[in-house]
Amino acid sequence: MSYMLKSIPPRHIQVFMFEKFTNRAKQVIKLAKKEAQRLNHNYLGTEHILLGLLKLGQGVAVNVLRTLGVDFDTAKNEVERLIGYGPEIQVYGDPALTGRVKKSFESANEEASILEHNYVGTEHLLLGILNQADGVALQVLENLHIDPKEIRKEILKELETFNLQLPPSSSITPRNTNSSSSSSSKSSSLGGHSLGGDKPEKLSALKAYGYDLTEMFKEARLDPVIGRSAEVERLILILCRRRKNNPVLIGEAGVGKTAIVEGLAQKIVSGEVPEALRKKRLITLDLALMIAGTKYRGQFEERIKAVMDEVRKHGNILLFIDELHTIVGAGAAEGAIDASHILKPALARGEIQCIGATTLDEYRKHIEKDAALERRFQKIVVQPPSVDETVEILRGLKKKYEEHHNVFITDEALVAAAKLSDQYVHGRFLPDKAIDLLDEAGARVRVNTMGQPSELLRLEAEIESTKQAKEQAIGTQEYEKAASLRDEEKKLREKLSNMKQQWESNKEEHQVPVDEEAVAQVVSVQTGIPAARLTEAESEKLLMLENTLQKKVIGQDQAVASICRAIRRSRTGIKDPNRPMGSFLFLGPTGVGKTLLAQQIAVEMFGGEDSLIQVDMSEYMEKFAATKMMGSPPGYVGHEEGGHLTEQVRRRPYCVVLFDEIEKAHPDIMDLMLQILEQGRLTDSFGRKIDFRNTIIIMTSNLGADLIRKTGEIGFGLRSHMDYGVIKEKIDAAVKKHLKPEFINRLDESVIFKPLEKEALSEIIHLEINKLGSRLQNHQMALNIPDSVVSFLVDKGHSPEMGARPLRRVVEQYLEDPLAEMLLKESCRQEARKLCARLIEERVIFEREDEISALAVEGDGPASVTADES
């Protein structure tokens, strides 16, 4: 190479050198020139090339240097320390190449030739400057405690990994062993330096595209596998068969299919397997990694063929393909075959053993359609574990999560994670959802306790304040004050360092516990149920429920008592857990509190009125309207939108579902509710089972309400309990006449609401007045309504046929309308603080305490204010 350069005219030497340089290598030269100009150097040395390589930020050389801990800033500081800046002179043109740089370029070309590369890249440039024993770049690396031999080893590894992604030459294909060995022998002594052996170990296809589970378990990188002994035993039996010894684990996502395979790896490592499996290696094949980067036809087939050849060669390899359905169609291009067709002959002959894992749906869609592929695999159906088995699994994983989050997990938290996830987290399966609850609970506790103590924060603020005062003193040339502040800052920093060390040690010693409350908070975030309601004693909460409802739903104590009894039966576990928490039919006249009671149940049981899903059954008067509830069938308009009811329950599975006025719906539509009431589920148009087990089903109806109005014995009060019993029998008869027996039998209870008595209406008026008073507080006003006015409002608003709703209009007409006019008056807005109401000849008069101001309201006309009245 030196002779060739001498025979070339000097003006053409650089052109010859850069002829094979890649774009990145040329960019390195440009960056190196800029670094030379920055340092005021009129030459380009090996140190500038090193800085150019690091500043480029990409390429094999940069990856290797970063792996060894060398970055641009570190190298730049070392170069500046060694050679410093040049004199401040104007440099015209490009800096001249030093002799060492020219030799390094020659060496880079030689390295590329040795590696049989027809280009010079950043890796060759790095090897070239390493060959200059007296170069500044090599001295910089040695000062940074970097061994050149390590750089060469890392470059070789990087190049071998890269070669696996190119069309094979091939280092992994057995048919090309001659070219592979010759290439290896040439690259074993790059630049005349040994790489730690006569021949470098080639990167195998299995190592490139897979992960050795048995090796990972030896290194304690896998979680322990608890239980699943039956599935692991069946897996071992299938693997020990002579033919068709390829098991496939089929189960829903999250039931632990991959964990079963890891359990097999655990048994292989511990020797708890038959002799035929004792020396086996279990390797997970990453199919996505194998497909990635295959730009040319035949590359994918070569890679998978190399894996199969290596499995045949070793003879002790068990392949595990997670998401087995991905092999169908994987790598198939125009004129090519997919992975499943490549694997099928070897699987049939027993040349390779493969363990698959996939879900039930994916197995049906992809594997079962290919009968030849299906018969080569033996199915193992994996069912979700029970709650007790999940608790044992969590106990086995407890230590791993304690170490990760640096917390202490109580046994109560493990039990709560299993039970609460099974009860409240739907659409997913144990043990995955229980593990996720425990993991998030540990993260929540850890994050909440990571904050620094207030004393540390105060000390840091004091240090910052002292530092600013010191800088200000330096700026004003008060050097004695600055020196004093410097000493004070030093003391504060020492104190801060000691406090931080003590805090860190205390944090490590005193682990924060993860208890049942922490798990309940995670469930609360995921489901919307207040955590306090989950952890509160059930007996206390259910005893409080009846009293709370009676305070808000007036005059229906018997109905409230009936629904509370049914809820107690459900929540104490006496009822069937596969049915809804409660299903009720509310009967009675309008305006007596049926919908209000449903709203209050939503508030008390689920924390808010937004947990009430209200379905107006008058929208389902036609038979075909049933599709609106659960979604249109496939092929019909609106299929992708889903059902109005099913989609709402999917998004909020913990709610009160109110079917209003069910007698207006088509009778056939009521048949849809049979499976909701009996089995606690409804299948939507997509085939998904919507869970109603954590809902309270309430239906309202006015059936038999006319009987209450026609009964002369019942006015605003019942004469005796027998009178109410007679009416109940008549209403029950009307319900049985209109609704089917199979529907009525599935209800927990039919609740009949009584007409409101006068005392109940008086309490309702007081509730409305209290609401009005709370709204007036925003205007700094207080309201005083005497009993005489309340009695007047009750007399004006009561109606046995209309219930309590007329009371709202009475309050608006006699109280809210005149108050609104008073608020609009400037004098009232500024001065009024407390308003008193008086009843004068069926007029409600409002007066201020400091100055009498009356506002008369005619019972049959709009509110008005006159000077005489005030």
Swiss-Prot record:
PROSITE patterns: CLP_R, UVR. This is Probable ATP-dependent Clp protease ATP-binding subunit. GO terms for molecular function: ATP binding; ATP hydrolysis activity. Residues 167-198 are annotated as: Disordered. One of its GO terms (cellular component) is cytoplasm. It holds the Pfam family AAA. Residues 168-189 have a biased composition (Low complexity). It comes from the Bacteria. SUPFAM superfamilies: Double Clp-N motif (SSF81923), P-loop containing nucleoside triphosphate hydrolases (SSF52540). GO terms for biological process: cellular response to heat. Residues 97-161 are annotated as: Repeat 2. ATP binds at residues 251-258, 588-595. The gene is clpC. Residues 18-161 form the Clp R domain. Residues 460-495 form the UVR domain. Keywords: ATP-binding, Chaperone, Nucleotide-binding, Repeat. Belongs to the ClpA/ClpB family. ClpC subfamily. InterPro entries: AAA+_ATPase (IPR003593), ATPase_AAA_core (IPR003959), Clp_ATPase_C (IPR019489), Clp_N_dom_sf (IPR036628), Clp_R_dom (IPR004176), ClpA/B (IPR001270), ClpA/ClpB_AAA_lid (IPR041546), ClpA_ClpB (IPR050130). Residues 21-86 are annotated as: Repeat 1.
